[in-house]
Design a protein with these regions (language model features):
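Active-site cofactor/substrate anionic-group-binding motifs, chiefly glycine-
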Residues: 33-34, 53-65
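Conserved anion-binding
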Residues: 3-7, 64-162, 168-173
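N-terminal basic/disordered segments at the start of proteins
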Residues: 6-15
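Glycine-rich phosphate-binding active-site loops on the catalytic face of alpha/beta enzymes
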Residues: 83-93, 167-168, 178-208
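Generic structural signal for well-ordered alpha-helices
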Residues: 19-23, 44-48, 73, 94-101, ...
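Conserved, mostly hydrophobic/aromatic
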Residues: 9, 32, 61, 86, ...
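Acidic (Asp/Glu)-rich catalytic clusters
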Residues: 2, 22-28, 41-53, 75-80, ...
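A C-terminal functional module that forms or caps the active site or interfaces directly
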Residues: 34, 38, 44, 144-194
Length: 214
């Protein structure tokens, strides 16, 4: 049986206010997702000081020659405290995907098939790309909100789905126009939801988090 849906915090805000809120939000979640924006603003040491001993999800969407990807992952494992997850492009070559899966790290690799902000994608083509990754051994995916139902129907509980762009009804106004609500995400079998701006914008972060818990 699948465990209850969990929340990951996407921490890419870099203003003074955003960084202060990032430190606060991090106290109440298990995992913090960081990307190019935050990592080009702060050092890994500064990020660790900001979020504490939380699991780190490195969202760099790696896509390069196999050895470069493998070496980068292994080096990040040494450089980032509590390195737990990383993303790579699921549309890359078989060899690169295998390199991401076999890198010497305890971090969990997540394949990205389609960006959550992309409204123009071919569903059948996307599902075929999921199948190819599954055949190569991928078990964890960043999943477009509008693909969750189809992916669950096709693969059942064989894979875990991490879904960005999850919004409350009151927040469905920014560039994640393809968003799911937390309730719908849970109904569709999402394992992890990734939430950023709604938490950074919240006046009461603890209360806002409760609205996302299902």
């Amino acid at each position: 049986m699948r465990n209850s849906m969990k929340i990951m915090f996407s921490a890419d805000g870099i203003s003074k206010s955003d960084l202060e809120k990032t430190a606060t939000v991090s106290k109440y979640v298990d995992c913090v997702k960081i990307g190019h924006i935050l990592c080009s603003t702060l050092s890994f040491k500064e990020i660790h000081e900001l979020v504490g001993d939380k699991d780190i999800f490195l969202d760099f969407k790696l896509h390069d020659i196999p050895n470069t990807v493998k070496t980068a992952i292994e080096n990040y494992s040494k450089a980032i405290p509590n390195f737990k997850y990383f993303t790579f492009h699921g549309t890359a070559s078989d060899e690169m995907i295998k390199a991401a899966l076999t890198a010497d790290t305890q971090a969990i690799p997540l394949a990205v098939i389609t960006l959550s902000s992309d409204a123009n994608f071919d569903k059948a083509d996307s599902l075929a790309k999921f199948q190819r990754c599954v055949d190569l051994g991928v078990e964890n995916f960043i999943c477009h909100p509008h693909l969750v139902a189809d992916v669950r129907a096709k693969f059942g509980d064989k894979i875990k789905l991490y879904v960005p762009g999850v919004r409350l009804e009151s927040d469905l106004s920014d560039d994640h126009f393809n968003a799911l609500t937390p309730k719908k995400a849970k109904e569709l079998g999402v394992d992890y939801i990734i939430v950023g701006r709604p938490l950074l914008r919240a006046e009461n972060i603890v209360e806002k988090l409760k609205e996302f818990e299902c």
